[in-house]
Amino acid sequence: MLTEVMRFYGLARPPIDAGFFETEHHAQMSRDIRTAIMGEAGPAPHQAKPGGMISGGGRLIALTSVIGSGKTILSRRLRAELEREGKVIVSRALSVDKAKISVPLLIAALFYDLSPEKQVKISSQSERRERDLQELFRRAKKPVALFIDDAHDLHPKTLTALKRLIELVAEGGGQLSIVLVGHPKLKNDLRRPKMEEIGDRMTVFEFGGLRDRQRDYIDWVLKASLGQGVTPENVLTDDGATLLAAKLKTPLQIGQHLVRAFEAGFEIGAKPIDTGVVEAVLSSQLDDLEPQLTRNGYDLRSLVEQFDAKPAEIRRLLRGDLDPGRTRELLDEMRAAGLPT
């Protein structure tokens, strides 16, 4: 965002990534997931699918939400809370290329986070490595929660092997819960018949993001971004804020459109920003099929693979010029698989 735009509207910082806007839904979701990790009784109210506890006490947990809803910040705060409480050891898989993550890589992550040694030695022999892992858990004497971000990119074979990893730890006297964080594609993939072995054991939490608090979020993010002595009403009319709240769903969308509105308003000297400027920057394609699928974690490759379609067919479907019969066929298949259409 240009500094001259920020000066014109009295912004101390761009209205993106301004911090954590906590709602009761955020707090309840955090409590529910923490309860699931600790293995305490009672299904959580936000639980989309009640998975079972795996033999030995470990759990498979999934936290899913659309792009830009704040699940990464929620996950980060949850990890910090668990570390502060000290009842659970928190581990993370940091590998960037999630599609190439395998169980040995996850075991390596556990070694690095659980080992008291500065120089961690991991055996190249699988039998020795797995026995050493069991010994690490026995020494830890606490449950462990392994967090995996962008889990919608994990290979199906890796997903199905997570159950065996939890059982391996349990057989050695330890307790491991695995928390997968990803887009709604992850939830839908877990419901596919070929994923039944792990899907039926997964506790899925669907994070609703702001829910109906978009208007409150706009006020909050403006107050967090504006300089001293500048109020939200000085830079954005009430009608303009209400229109943004009605059209947008996530903090990421709101932040991006506020930036666009300020930049467009600066060009014409509009202060405060009114509904005319807001309408000009709102995309008419915001709720088209392609952006909806993208927000849920689907790209061209994943759609081609899942629905046995040709890339050209998917491109034409997204453009709206695929023949009606094939369009109905693909959209019916997508709806049946849980995709937003």
Model-derived features: where do they sit?
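Conserved catalytic network of the ASCE P-loop NTPase/AAA+ motor domain
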Residues: 38-39, 52-56, 83-86, 136-140, ...
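Sensor-1/coupling segment of RecA-like P-loop NTPase cores
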Residues: 43, 56, 62-68, 124-128, ...
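P-loop NTPase Walker A phosphate-binding motif
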Residues: 64-89
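AAA+/P-loop NTPase substrate/partner-engagement loops
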Residues: 83-109
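Mid-core helix/loop region of P-loop NTP-binding domains shared across ATPases and GTPases
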Residues: 101-109, 116-161, 170-173, 234-243, ...
